[in-house]
Amino acid sequence: MKKTLLVVDDEPTIQLILRRYFEADFTVVPQPNGQEAMRWLDEGNTADAIVADYEMPVMNGPAFILRLRNSLMQRHVPLIMLSGKEESSTKIQCLRHGADDYMVKPFNPEELDLRLKNMMRKLSF
């Protein structure tokens, strides 16, 4: 059975890129913002890994991370934050909120794949 990758990004192009790249190994579930992603998770769905954008309407990336990490069922799910912001202060904010990693857009899908799989492998021990 495929693992589930939750993609939280308001850009349809990013959702499409990630779906096409990861669909062989994951069931990819796109959500347009943190609020919709939390609603999906609160309905009893689970994710094995999450890729989330920093800047989104309704609930942005940092707010999503905080809600996710306060959820008993989802607090340990590997999460990589994507952003067009290169400032170290943005990266530090995301990591402090509970992101496991941070990548700047544009990103290399293969690198993202390796980072996700490495995190998931470490959790399986």
Set out the residue ranges of the language-model regions.
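Receiver (REC) domain active-site loop signature in two-component systems and cognate sites
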Residues: 56
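Short, conserved "switch-loop" micro-motifs in signal-transduction and mechanochemical regulators
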Residues: 85-86
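Two-component/phosphorelay signaling modules centered on CheY-like receiver
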Residues: 12-30
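C-terminal output helix
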Residues: 107-116
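Acidic, metal-coordinating helix/loop segments flanking the phosphotransfer/catalytic sites
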Residues: 32-49
